[in-house]
Amino acid sequence: MGCFGLIGTITSDHITVDDRSAIQGLGGILYQAAVLCGLGEDVHLFANCGEVSRHDVEETVAGWPTLRRDGLTFVPGPGNQVHLRYAERLKEREEVLESAVPPLDAAPVLARLPEFDALLMVFNSGFEFERAAWRRIVAGARCPIWLDVHSFVLARLLGAHRDYVAVPDWREWMAGVTYLQANRQEVASLRGHPERWPSAEEIAAFAGDAFAVGIRAVLVTIGKDGVLVLTGDGPRQVFAPAADRVVDTTGCGDVFAAATLRLLTRGVPLVEAATAGVVLASKAVGLAGIAETYRLARSARE
């Protein structure tokens, strides 16, 4: 059993697909927690969550014996209420964040940091940390860090559509992490051109910039086409098996990240680990929600 630190935000998701009301439920960092706990790993969760979601969260994770909740704090208010919209005409999902929780304190993470085999950080909202606090964690880590860009590249506002924005200071946030996960739209924002997706050559150039600040690998998720794995040895595409059906793609990248990082801590080579992660993620699109994701991981373990 490995020991993982998991940092992010628990969200309450309200999801529509092609303008039809579809799914409501918990989301955010609980997707990664569901996978790692379902696979039998020891997980220390660091997250702020709205008090109104306490019952739902505690009920959801009650049967996860390897989840350590000492870093989970319930704060007054509704927490992260997120409206997500998917449609065929959209290149990426649209997000409206109605409310948010305060940034996390680095101290509880730093206290546990020496115990971890790996640290997985997700910017579920983009409001998780002040930069100085996050940099203290990166500086103190002696284990691999996987960072998922996610909502870091969305405009920092509440109650309105969050546009993708350029983030010129991304190196100051991400330097020194081991694995950087982003999709093409997120890479576009980090490159300073959120208005268009990058070409293969531009993705490779971005990866070169990442390597220059100590990042060992860049993993660019490309939807049903799988993942681009970029290292100093060049790019490799890991193809995704065709999904039997598509119910909800919300947690697909989260499943990929958790499953891949788990194997990396066991010494599995990066491309092989990413291949297994993509396979599990392709199964995850056929279900919806945290509880079903946990059951999927349990079945993969068995």
Model-predicted regions and their roles:
Residues H55-D70, A141, R196-G214, G234-D244:
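Short, electropositive alpha-helical surface patch
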Residues V153-G234:
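Conserved phosphate/ATP/ADP-binding segment of small-molecule kinases
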Residues L36, N183, G253:
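Short, conserved phosphate/pyrophosphate- and ester-handling motifs at nucleotide-, phospho-/glycolipid
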Residues S21-A34:
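Short catalytic helix/loop segments, enriched in acidic residues and glycine
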